[in-house]
Curated annotation (Swiss-Prot):
Binding site for Zn(2+) 1: C70, C72, C85, C88
Binding site for Zn(2+) 2: C821, C895, C902, C905
GO biological process: DNA-templated transcription
GO cellular component, one term: DNA-directed RNA polymerase complex
Cofactor binding description: Binds 1 Mg(2+) ion per subunit. Binds 2 Zn(2+) ions per subunit.
Quaternary structure (record): The RNAP catalytic core consists of 2 alpha, 1 beta, 1 beta' and 1 omega subunit. When a sigma factor is associated with the core the holoenzyme is formed, which can initiate transcription.
Biased composition (Low complexity): 1413-1427
Protein origin, superkingdom: Bacteria
Region (Disordered): 1413-1438
Name of the featured protein: DNA-directed RNA polymerase subunit beta'
Entry GO MF terms: DNA binding; DNA-directed RNA polymerase activity; magnesium ion binding; zinc ion binding
Alphabetical UniProt keywords: DNA-directed RNA polymerase, Magnesium, Metal-binding, Nucleotidyltransferase, Transcription, Transferase, Zinc
Cofactor or coenzyme needed: Mg(2+); Zn(2+)
Amino acid sequence: MNELTKFTNQLAKPETFDQIQIGIASPERIRSWSFGEIKKPETINYRTFKPERDGLFCARIFGPVKDYECLCGKYKRMKYKGVVCEKCGVEVTVTKVRRERMGHIELAAPVAHIWFLKSLPSRIGLLLDMQLKQLERVLYFEHYIVTEPGLTPLEKFQLLTEDELLEAQDEYGEDAFSAGIGAEAVKFMLMDLDLEQEKEDLLEELATTKSKLKPAKIIKRLKVVESFIESGNRPEWMILEVVPVIPPELRPLVPLDGGRFATSDLNDLYRRVINRNNRLKRLIELRAPDIIVRNEKRMLQESVDALFDNGRRGRVITGANKRPLKSLSDMLKGKQGRFRQNLLGKRVDYSGRSVIVTGPELKLHQCGLPKKMALELFKPFIYARLDAKGLSMTLKQAKKWVEKERKEVWDILDEVIREHPVLLNRAPTLHRLGIQAFEPVLIEGKAIQLHPLVCSAFNADFDGDQMAVHVPLSLEAQLEARVLMMSTNNILSPANGKPIIVPSQDMVLGLYYLSMERQEKTPEYIEEKDGTKIEKLPRFADMAEVHQALETKSVTLHTRIIARVPQADEDGKPEMKRFVTTPGRMLIGECLPKNHKVPYDIVNRLLTKKEIGDVIDQVYRHTGQKDTVLFADAIMVLGFRHAFKAGISFGKDDMIIPDSKEGMIEDTKKQVADYEQQYQDGLITQQEKYNKVIDAWSRCGDQVAEAMMDEIKSQKFDKDGKESEINSIYMMSHSGARGSPAQMKQLAGMRGLMAKPSGEIIENPIISNFKEGLTVLEYFNSTHGARKGLADTALKTANSGYLTRRLVDVSQDCVIVEEDCKTDNALEMRAIVQGGSVIASLGERILGRTLVDDLVNAKTDEVIVKAGTLLDEPMVKAIEEAEVQVARIRSPLVCEADQGVCATCYGRDLARGTPVNIGEAVGVIAAQSIGEPGTQLTMRTFHIGGAAQLNETSHLESISDGKVEYRDMPTITDKKGRILSLARNGELAVIDAEGREREIHKVPYGTVLMHKDGAKVKEGDRLAEWDPFSLPIITEQSGVVKYQDLIEGTTLEEQTDDATGIAQRVVTENRATGRKKKEDLRPRLTLLSEGQSEDETEAQRYLLAPGTTLSVTDGQTVEAGDILARASREAAKTRDITGGLPRVAELFEARVPKDNAVIAKISGKIEFVREYKAKRKIAIVPEEGEAVDYLIPKTKVIDVQEGDFVKKGDTLISGSPNPHDILDVLGVEALAEYLCTEIQEVYRLQGVKINDKHIEVIVRQMLQKVEITDGGDTVLLPGEQVDRDEMDEANAKLGRGKKPATGNPVLLGITKASLQTRSFISAASFQETTRVLTQASVEGKKDTLIGLKENVIVGRLIPAGTGAGMNRMRVTASARDAALRAQWKKQQEKLAAADEAAMAAEKEPEAEVMDADAMAAAMGGDSAGGDTKPEAPEASEE
């Protein structure tokens, strides 16, 4: 027995295994775990509280209830350890064994395991090739099944009712065939299966099948059959003969007072199983009638089902209080299940929580810890110190002292706490800056003090927030806390590399106030000798004089002065320089570190919040961390002091309502009335009127706001030239301390348009502002949107958290594994330009990335930066100055590292500003960076009327000087002399003087081009414009128009606008009427050249989609360039712009959008093949090769006409592109670019900056899988989805001359990707636990514990950060062990070769669970490396 405890405990140490395998337990395996059979349903005796013998809590099976004491009390105490009492049969040992010993129930009839039956796809069903419905009929005793048809005409696996069975037996004789019912029959069929034979049959069928749908089904079955063969699981183990019973301490029964018991639901479920099982045994012994026995067997099957997974089949079994009982599956599932509640999240000792208050006098690395809390948290350390100092003799005395809080204790607490960091955490911890380390400073009171600058990282405010404190105990933990987690080491945000320790609110206001200039009197000028005029200003020699002048009030903080400011030169020597500045700015300048790279100029300006952030950024880049921290602390103190000294406040008169407001509102009202009139006259539609009204009012609101801002900003001077005080509200808003122009607009401008909860905008705006007060109606209108905002916020938090969870799950195992993967692939980066303005410059996008090619200055041909360099700020500046347009960089997307990313592809660690370290968990950082701002995103989908959204995108302006170049763009000049583009996918490029492309735009069909090809343009020139609301059909030659298949009433109707009475001819959809076969009507316009008759085929045809408005009449003569018809772009007009969180989730989940665009898969000419009832088929015919067909619903507007030439990747039907199509047609880089741009778009609208590389890391994780197109000579099957690594492994195993497998990359959404990771532990702890575990156990999966999550679950250091080094050491150590072991084996074999008989004897135990050497190693460490894990046999062979 001692061996056994030694052995089990040995296994319990987490270091002793390398992988975890999951499989299906055989009945023998279950019996071998068990310490005895449970025969009775009793639990404990209600009077004595002792467990009943042979019951569910039996002490004989599971172990003693009290430590070292048998049940009857004959043997007590340690000395009898290991004795088995002869009276009660209980072994004397620790009671802890009741947590680990299992029992079992021998079933009187086999039952099917519900997981393998009902978890879709049903494994039993796939193996037997039966439908689940039929299987259930057999298992639940409704039908018989023919297991052996013999010579009868019955089919194998045919279902028979009882009557049919009797008939068949009468007809063919009882012994001619065999049929069974229930789990016994299924078990017999499973035992009968010959898996190898089945596999051969399936492979043959796969090779010969002709149908399209068959292969998928065959592959499914084949995979199950193969996984059974490979894993060594036997199919019949899916049918249970023995049910294991988990240890009693894991399903406790606790007596409550009053003689009642609180019990775990599992006990009820087990009791049910035992009762039914015993009843069944008795019935079988009594030879009861078949029907009774069968019913009892069915009930047994149902009770075992409920035990394993209650509610999976049939009714949920409920307890006494009508609550469903929690089955074994429920114990694992969900947030409260074993995985997420106990393995991934645990409660922590040595922790406390309290309210936080601000601590402005703290240094950045400190926090105030209440004495009471510290005393409790550091207790063990205090005891140790008291003992070491010899102050207290015993632990008891030490405890007393601490409880009495004697003064010695406080002194010792001070010693203990010194230099011992504590961790502070504010929930919700959305990113890694939500837990930071500080050095505690003991304070009176009961609240924790927090340094104001770290609030933004914790997202904390002091309105009652609470924070938790944790104490790192071990030396290593303290070291990590100090070196990695100290608040001073987290100055930059990991999401975007910008400082996150930035003053906010009061501090910003104080600094802004300090850095302002205010004119005291009209400036006087002195004329120099050379005639230049210099302003006459007070001059100061140094800071001391300035201080004195301020004290004597001879200057104010804002007076313009000339002063000498000490600067450091390149060698660090001080030198004095003159600056025109103000005393206030000099105070800020005093805080700057003395460094020649940080000149006084950077604070010699008006400092807003953004500017202060830039200053801190520059200080950090040039002078390092220590100086930055000192600087940050200094300006914090300065900011607070001067905000308080300035005494800035505002009253109602500071909100100035502009006088021009009335006039603007009157004008707008006139305009709106005008639009109303136009609508009445039928010149515009209802939708257009709505758009225009909304447009007019939003313009009016902006104008009022602008007038108000001008009024507030304006500087007024009195007669002496003294400037009036600056408006306080403006100061607060402009400095970035509090408030925004939008809020000021509501206070003193006009509130503007409001939205309904549906997201639509109400046409009547709120004209008043808060200063004037709202009318009742206006107030009511505004409550609408406000209430929705509050409801949204609640939903948002949950949604955002779930998105973060999915992101973390998909990317958790993405870690930096090596320095450089040496790949040649790269991504092309260029600036993002939208609507003529640069949104993200090239420099911003490539900062901190590794270059792939040399970057060359186009003008001078010199190399600016060499390939392979990590770009830092100065290099990026040089690149931007040389106006480089495109750079190729390394990216996590193209990295070829195994099981992670390499440092070169990732580039700079944003939170440190240095190259990333090996072991950095970049996946988790990426997930947090994207998920953390999630709560700031909106939840709503915007329904924006066309005008408001699309008026910006109806023209193009040039962003640079250069010449225009049209690519693939045929044009035509109409009779007005305008140049029209006839290209579906033409590009308009602007080329500068050096021949570099400055911008490339795709312009829609029918665009009016402003310039001839090759014309010179200046920055800001208009290049093109188009109508965003309709898609024209333009004639390319002159001729006569003929209507074809345009029949009044069927395909053409005159639509009159109700309000206006103006008629338009609109093509309608033709629905087949009557019985007769519908004529195939293809409404189209044909253009005949003059003098052509209709049957000649040269005519141009234009097919019309339903909803097209005709602009010409039948037989009209038209010129080239005329518009024949307009297809309304209704789709684009009020397309809901899915905004915010839902959009981000949609992109990451790789969902196919609702109206998805159709993309051309190849280049070629368009041909309309034929029409069907609701669809039309069009084909793209390439110059060589096969045509590709598309089926397109007739209601969709097709962007191309017959005969057009399209390029691969062009859109045939506009809409949101489908990411899967982009991947198939245009490849990985295009997809990454698309996802990055789209996701960044959402965040950019909210003003959130996230570095592209985080999105790239997630997209990389979504592209891990490939779909096999050709299995080659490997075991992989075409159509199967496997990890890219798996495909590479399979190919690597092939010999020479064999054909490797090939595959295409597949895009998986984040949820799907998480569920398909190679680690089943990680997948099971994410979602759909039962499904994942069922699948894994069938395949006999091994979890190699590579990712972070699996290691947290089994309780190890994670293989990232400081754990990465340990991990590498473990791997090398185990490799050496394996080598030594192999050597030792060889020696043993040599010795054994002498003695054949000994060898035979040695073989037997080796077939046990572990091979003998691994066993020996596990017992007592082994020859080489102490307790490094014994290598699994396969690994040592590799």
